[in-house]
């Protein structure tokens, strides 16, 4: 009898459970969910432009358990600049660490600590653009387009010591921009490869300007020029002798206008070969390359400047003969192309 009563009760409870689940399932589920989630919450991270309040997409953040110092989740902001974690235990401390941000914003390296105290928690992380970016706009795709740059490159003149040393003076200005304690004369005398002019069988013999500086940059009459490669080598030798690996030198011959603007937007000044009078190259001089029978024709109005920024239709530069100057962009890049598209960077 007891067995029959027990089985009847069990059957009734089972039937009642099935009935409640079928008729009140949503409420039961909600009650269970509330019970399970009552000690959990989410963290919403908002990534914004510190100056203009633009939401920043594609910002990545690590959520770190402060007690264990373990990364428990990585989140990325959507196009509206918002990212939300999964459920996290309440009453715990967490660190929020930004690991990636859309260019040209600077990474926010602060580690933000907070305690998760409610079901919905929110923190705003701000990012700045570098100070050399003077203006920018937001595109329809929510990217940032830099419209004005001015790099703080100091004016260094080649004269009077280096009447024909615009190339190495331009390099000196770039190294000064990065904080190196060198100067145009040290670079010219100690590091720049040079080949003096000589005469053989009544023929003028000199350097391949892709391999070494032709002549002596200290001389008004015996100095001429080089292209980018010897100046790249000058910087590489300087870094090697001084055991410096913090910067790299790169030949960027053939770069487009867009390529160069992008470099400037990243804070990288560009050493560019143009002409001294901003007119088309006058290729009206020649000599034989030392050690060969090859004769080369070279421009007599070659000049080298440092591009430092841009705005609207203008490009800013440091001219080793004049100091800071402004060029009309279309004209400058036309001359640059005619002069062979020679350029280099240190970054």
Please identify what each model-predicted range represents.
Residues 67, 89, 100-102, 253, ...:
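A mature extracytoplasmic/lumenal domain signature
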Residues 55, 89, 140-143, 262-269, ...:
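Extracellular/periplasmic catalytic domains that process cell-envelope and extracellular macromolecules
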Residues 22, 28-32, 58, 70, ...:
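Active-site-adjacent structural segments surrounding the nucleophilic cysteine of cysteine proteases
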Residues 2-138:
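Solvent-exposed loop/turn and edge beta-strand elements of beta-rich ligand-binding domains
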Residues 178-188, 243-254:
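Surface-exposed patches in mature extracellular/periplasmic domains of secreted proteins
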Residues 256-260:
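Surface-exposed ligand/attachment interfaces on beta-rich extracellular proteins
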Residues 242-247, 265-271, 311-314, 341-342:
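Loop/turn elements at helix/coil->beta-strand transitions in domains of secreted/extracellular proteins
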Residues 286-299, 305-347:
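Noncatalytic regulatory segments and standalone regulatory/sensor domains
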């Amino acid at each position: 009898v007891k067995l029959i009563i027990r089985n009847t009760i069990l059957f009734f409870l089972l039937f009642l459970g099935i009935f409640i689940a079928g008729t009140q399932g949503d409420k039961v589920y909600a009650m269970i969910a509330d019970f399970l989630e009552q000690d959990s919450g989410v963290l919403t991270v908002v990534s914004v432009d510190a100056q203009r309040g633009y939401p920043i997409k594609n910002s990545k953040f690590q959520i770190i358990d402060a007690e264990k110092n373990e990364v428990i989740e990585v989140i990325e902001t959507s196009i509206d600049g918002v990212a939300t974690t999964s459920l996290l235990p309440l009453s715990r401390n967490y660190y929020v660490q930004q690991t990636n941000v859309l260019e040209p914003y600077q990474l926010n390296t602060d580690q933000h600590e907070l305690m998760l105290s409610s079901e919905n928690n929110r923190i705003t992380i701000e990012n700045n653009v570098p100070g050399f970016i003077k203006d920018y706009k937001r595109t329809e795709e929510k990217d940032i387009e830099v419209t004005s740059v001015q790099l703080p490159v100091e004016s260094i003149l080649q004269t009077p010591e280096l009447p024909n040393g615009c190339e190495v003076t331009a390099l000196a200005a770039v190294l000064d921009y990065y904080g190196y304690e060198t100067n145009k004369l040290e670079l010219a005398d100690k590091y720049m490869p040079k080949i003096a002019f000589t005469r053989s069988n009544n023929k003028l013999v000199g350097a391949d300007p892709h391999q070494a500086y032709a002549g002596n940059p200290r001389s008004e009459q015996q100095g001429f020029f080089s292209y980018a490669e010897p100046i790249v080598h000058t910087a590489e030798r300087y870094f090697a002798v001084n055991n410096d690996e913090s910067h790299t030198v790169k030949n960027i011959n053939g770069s487009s206008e867009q390529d160069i603007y992008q470099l400037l937007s990243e804070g990288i000044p560009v050493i560019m070969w143009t002409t001294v009078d901003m007119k088309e190259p006058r290729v009206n001089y020649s000599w034989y390359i030392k050690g060969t029978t090859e004769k080369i024709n070279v421009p007599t109005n070659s000049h080298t400047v440092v591009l430092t920024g841009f705005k609207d239709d203008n490009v800013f530069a440091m001219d080793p003969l004049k100091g800071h100057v402004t060029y009309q962009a279309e004209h400058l890049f036309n001359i640059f192309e005619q002069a062979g598209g020679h350029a280099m960077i240190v970054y």
